[in-house]
Amino acid sequence: MRVAEVVRNTSETQIRVKLDLDGTGRQKLATGVPFLDHMLDQIARHGLVDLEVEAHGDTHIDDHHTVEDVGITLGQAVAKAIGDRKGIRRYGHSYVPLDEALSRVVIDFSGRPGLEFHVPFTRARIGTFDVDLSIEFFRGFVNHAGVTLHIDNLRGINAHHQLETVFKAFGRALRAAVELDERAAGQIPSTKGSL
């Protein structure tokens, strides 16, 4: 089974992430940031990842450290769960619509962290959630999972719909990329022989 648990403790946050990449989408989420919980639920359900996230952070200041550190810890957990990356498909992509919004996410488990984030949000906040924190979440994930990630919101008017399509597409792209390829069993998906 491809499971992992990672704990991250700093002076700003205490985070625990437990996941099963071959799950069914079950989740138990308690980050202290309700909108982040809603987005993590999209990753679990659409990525078919069993996901537990518990976070305690300095949200009395703002949600920045909690959101970023959850991204970091999730990236570490995914990297730990897939190990040497043998047999994975490596690449994944997804387009997801929600009413007027449409987003595309493309991921490569290349071992080279890189983020292209192009979401022209129509407002700065979704409820109390600062939309800029979504970039920090994905940057943290990318840097610690060792992936290249391209996120594009192709259209949208409602900022909630824009971000929800991003997280749903991310979950689906993640699922596709970490899926085991029977034809490449035991092989590193790279001509270099390593990722």
Curated annotation (Swiss-Prot):
GO biological process, any: L-histidine biosynthetic process
Pfam families registered for this protein in UniProt: IGPD
TM segment ranges: none
Entry keyword annotation includes Amino-acid biosynthesis: yes
Broad class of enzyme this protein falls into: lyase
MF terms in GO: imidazoleglycerol-phosphate dehydratase activity
Sorted UniProt keywords: Amino-acid biosynthesis, Cytoplasm, Histidine biosynthesis, Lyase
Compartment annotation: Cytoplasm
Pathway it works in: Amino-acid biosynthesis; L-histidine biosynthesis; L-histidine from 5-phospho-alpha-D-ribose 1-diphosphate: step 6/9
Catalyzed reactions: D-erythro-1-(imidazol-4-yl)glycerol 3-phosphate = 3-(imidazol-4-yl)-2-oxopropyl phosphate + H2O
EC number: 4.2.1.19
Keyword Lyase: yes
Main location group: cytoplasm
One Gene Ontology cellular component annotation held by this UniProt entry: cytoplasm
PANTHER family for this protein: IMIDAZOLEGLYCEROL-PHOSPHATE DEHYDRATASE, IMIDAZOLEGLYCEROL-PHOSPHATE DEHYDRATASE HIS7
UniProt family annotation: Belongs to the imidazoleglycerol-phosphate dehydratase family.
Protein name: Imidazoleglycerol-phosphate dehydratase
Organism for this UniProt entry: Burkholderia cenocepacia (strain HI2424)
Lineage, broadest ranks: Bacteria, Pseudomonadati, Pseudomonadota, Betaproteobacteria, Burkholderiales
